[in-house]
């Protein structure tokens, strides 16, 4: 399959069960410990109401967050990512000041059998286009120092390391790197 064999779109409010299923699959991936802040054990215990609320919030207009999925011809959700809008003057999850309005990509996942065909770039292209429509000045994401596969995929999607490094939330002896995609104003 190629990236053109998928429909990349925003999730709909009623699709919370599919959101939950894909999240649980992602959290079982071999690199989930360094790719996601949440664990499978925590996620599986969360109430369905949390997934309903996430899906409903993501589907709202206007929204400060939007989740995108890549849907295969057979209806399978092959991958997903979420873009959060961070407002200038707010603080991020580390307590650092957000200096400008920006998108923050989280929850990036593509099922193993759908990797290597350009799908991740198609997801990023759609997410970044939405972020630009929201008036952000750049888009960023964080990636674990040891997640080389993800770093390569992010580079292929146009992201570059910014030089910002933060301690990994689960283990202060490890780091995460900020990657950014910026454009001229």
Question: For each of these PLM feature ranges, what is it?
Answer:
Residues 1-7, 185:
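Short, low-complexity, intrinsically disordered N-terminal peptides in bacterial proteins
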Residues 7-21, 33:
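A short beta-loop-alpha structural element at the N-terminal edge
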Residues 107, 111-125, 133-134, 145-152, ...:
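Conserved glycine-rich acetyl-CoA-binding loop
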Residues 21-113, 124-126, 130, 167, ...:
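Acetyl-CoA-dependent GNAT
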Residues 9, 143-144:
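Active-site-adjacent beta-strand anchor residues
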Residues 7, 104-106, 139:
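Conserved Rossmann-like nucleotide-binding pocket used by diverse enzymes
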Residues 137-138, 144-151, 155-185:
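C-terminal "cap" of GNAT-fold acetyltransferases
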């Amino acid at each position: 399959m190629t990236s053109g064999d998928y429909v990349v779109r925003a999730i709909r409010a009623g699709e919370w069960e599919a959101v939950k299923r894909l999240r649980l699959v992602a959290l079982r991936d071999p690199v989930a410990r360094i790719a996601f802040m949440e664990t499978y054990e925590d996620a599986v215990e969360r109430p369905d109401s949390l997934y309903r609320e996430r899906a409903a919030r993501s589907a709202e207009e206007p929204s400060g967050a939007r989740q995108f999925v890549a849907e295969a011809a057979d209806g399978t959700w092959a991958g997903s990512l979420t873009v959060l809008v961070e407002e200038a003057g707010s603080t991020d999850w580390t307590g650092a000041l957000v200096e400008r309005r920006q998108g923050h990509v989280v929850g990036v996942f593509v099922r193993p059998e759908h990797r290597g065909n350009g799908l991740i770039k198609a997801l990023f292209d759609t997410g970044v286009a939405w972020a630009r429509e929201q008036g952000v000045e750049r888009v960023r994401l964080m990636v674990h120092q040891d997640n080389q596969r993800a770093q390569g995929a992010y580079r292929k999607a146009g992201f570059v390391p910014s030089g910002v490094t933060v301690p990994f939330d689960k283990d202060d002896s490890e780091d995460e790197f900020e990657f950014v995609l910026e454009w001229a104003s």
